[in-house]
Structures are given as C-alpha cells and as structure tokens.
Amino acid sequence: MKYISTRGGIEPITFDQAVMMGLARDGGLLLPETLPSISAQQLDVWQNFHYQTLALEVLDMFSGDMPRNDLDDLIERAYSSFRHPQITPIRKTGDLYIMELFHGPTLAFKDVALQLLGNLFEYELKKSGGFMNIIGATSGDTGSAAIYGVRGKKGINIFILHPHERTSPIQALQMTTVTDANVFNIAVNGTFDDAQAIVKDLFSDLEFKDTYQLGAINSINWARVLAQVVYYIFAVLKLRRQGFTSIDFSVPTGNFGDIFAGYIARQLLPEGCIKRLILATNSNDILTRFVTQGDYSIAGKVTPTLSPSMDIQIASNFERYLYYLHGQDGSRVKADMETFAATGSMDLSAFREQAALDFASRSVSEEETIATIREYYQKHDYLLDPHTAVGIRAAQELRV
C-alpha cells in the first residue's frame, strides 16, 4: 500500500512514511493510492470479532510494510486504557442507536484514534532512533486526547495550540493540568481556525519542518482517519447481527475528519452496508452549505456555540473529499485550495448532485441542541453532550 498527496506533488510513500509525514510536502493531505475492498464473505468471517481483532484486520490492509505482530501489539496497547471492553459500544436509545465514543482516557471520541497514533509514533521513532516535535491545534477535544496519547513517551514533545477561553472548562483543565515534561500548552488569542492556520504555516515551511522534525497529530494525519474507519465497520457488523443490512450514520461534524472516515468505510464495504451519511453541523455551517448549495465559503467569524469542538469554518479534511470529487486529479485540487486560501471561497456548485449522493446535511441551532438534550434526558434518562445532540437532531429532521 502506497500513499500519495491530494495535490499530486510527491512520489508515492509507505505507510510508515505517511504516519511520520502528516501533511504532505506539497501542502496536500495523504491518501492511499488505491482503496481495498471488503467482501461480504470477509464480513461473515469478521462478524463476531472483538474490536481489537477487527482493528488489526482493517489496519493491516493499509499498513503492509509493518509486521502484523507489531501492529497487533500497538493496537492492544492503544486500547488497554479504555473503560469498556467493546471500546465503542452501541446503545439503543429510543428509535436510534448511539455509538458511544467516550470510553477512552479523556472521554473524547478522538481517544480512539490518538491512543493508537501515539503508540505508532513511539514505535516508528524507536526504529529510527529519531525524535519528533508534534505541533497541533485544537478546538477542544483533540488537544487533551493528543496529550494523553503521547504524554511521557520517549523521543516526543507535543505543543498544542488552543483558542483562549473558547474550549470548555473541563477540556482546558485536561490540557493545562498535565505536568509531563514533554507536554506544552499554548493559548492563542483567536479562534481554532487561527490556531490551525499557524500549524499549517509551520508545516508548509519545509526547512523548519525538517530542522525541528515536526509531526502532525491533527486529523490531517491519515492514521487518525484510518483508526476511525474501524468503528464504522464495527458498528455495521454489530447491527448486522441484529438483522440490519443497511445503516445510516449521523455524524456531528466540524473538521470533516470523522465523517470522512465514514465515507472511506462506505467505499471499503459491500455496496449498501452504509446507506446515508448525515453531516450534522452547528451554526458554523460551511459544510452544510456545501452539501445543500454547493457553497464552500467562509461566512463571517466563527460563532461560539455549546458544541465548541465543531466551531470551525475551515474543515481541514475537506480537501481529501475534494480529491475524489475531482476524479483524483491533484492539479485541480491544488488550484481550488489555492483559490480558497486567497479568497476564502470555492464555487463547488458543479458538484451538488454528487455531494447529495454522498451526504445529507443539516445545521442545528443552539435552541434545537438544548431541546434535544432535554428530550433525551426526560424520555430516555440518557444525558447527551451537545455534539451528540447535534447529530441526533439532524438524524431526526432528515429521517426518511
């Protein structure tokens, strides 16, 4: 399995190289050169696999240059800190199923990917004898999950930028109370997009990146997306045992990483296993406007909401989807991204029909978020966090 850039400017590289490179050297994002496929027969074999065993099978399809025993060990260590034996259990609540992604050490869904990525980094650095300075930006949950993924690990320093007073209090405390010597927290006077822009600028300076051995832990790193692909397949298998042959996923979305993992899972699985991917946003709705209007443009300033991890206007992973929209033509992706960087806008109205086939989408207001939390607590004695409430409300409104 080789990896290429969405902008077409690098030679194919290995999985090991992709993990360590993070952002491609031409400024693009890394993707597999080709996508494998999972047959119905394979799903039958995997039907009763534990989460870690399934993760081994899925990741092994993408990491052919890593010994299988080593990968197995990394996966076991990554998920040993989770509080639930199923890692990402599914709970029926009302007429919906909720995939619980909060059983990791920081209670954030990003623990699923970042516990694995931290172990991958340590493994690669031990092999090479090198070191890494991880630079990342967070709107809340990435920062604490990233820190807990690499705290105390040899050969790694981590620098996390977060928007000052724009994360939840518990997220700020999770980050700033970690006292390990390799952890550095930096508050930025601005939004998540401002922090992310600093990170991208640092990675675009190739001399600086090479001199200081920068590594990426944000969802621009392909390994993070890949780790999330696993739980979509796990959910399909679990619900398949209950007789469901086709499943809709509603995904609270800010940076487009989690729902893009669902998009990749749908490409891997037999046709029809994943029917609809519902892209749920809060009032920072650039992605909803893209799906419904073909308009991918920054609309004013980021609006602070009750779901701060989605308070994003520039979705870093969108470029990966754009690559597939453009028929895997890196030159067209590069041109579009340069236009967006210069103007804050891309006219993608020509892709409205394809986007509507790939996604449904709805923006959820603060009032709707609160009402959904209240409804689920009163009816089901189940307390939703605001991000989950956004996903549930979108699913309710777009039910077919």
Identify the meaning behind each predicted range:
Residues 1-400:
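PLP-dependent amino-acid enzyme catalytic core
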